[in-house]
Amino acid sequence: MKYQPLYDRVLVEPIQNDEAHGKILIPDTAKEKPTEGIVVMVGGGYRNDKGDITPLKVKKGDTIVYTKWAGTEIKLESKDYVVIKESDILLVKS
């Protein structure tokens, strides 16, 4: 992939929660947005108050939980991703 998130942004591959709801088929428009994902790429960091670059705490491969309305959904090379700010990440799973 030839893309790179900028600053404090993180490229995330959402983890779809495809739990069965009995025999009811739920259309895509009614499904909950995923709030878990795998970090694919991270930006270079953000500038702190002193002007220094502060690297991000998350890294490629981390499984994260992020806020429901975080980021921008994009499609790259036929795959769905979300670009979010590190501040929208609530948890890193270990």
From Swiss-Prot:
A GO CC annotation given for this chain: cytoplasm
GO terms assigned for molecular function: ATP binding; metal ion binding; protein folding chaperone; protein-folding chaperone binding; unfolded protein binding
Annotated compartments: Cytoplasm
InterPro entries, alphabetized: Chaperonin_GroES (IPR020818), Chaperonin_GroES_sf (IPR037124), Chaprnonin_Cpn10_CS (IPR018369), GroES-like_sf (IPR011032)
Keywords from the UniProt entry: Chaperone, Cytoplasm
Function: Together with the chaperonin GroEL, plays an essential role in assisting protein folding. The GroEL-GroES system forms a nano-cage that allows encapsulation of the non-native substrate proteins and provides a physical environment optimized to promote and accelerate protein folding. GroES binds to the apical surface of the GroEL ring, thereby capping the opening of the GroEL channel.
Subunit composition and interactions: Heptamer of 7 subunits arranged in a ring. Interacts with the chaperonin GroEL.
Protein name: Co-chaperonin GroES
Organism: Orientia tsutsugamushi (Rickettsia tsutsugamushi)
Lineage: Bacteria, Pseudomonadati, Pseudomonadota, Alphaproteobacteria, Rickettsiales
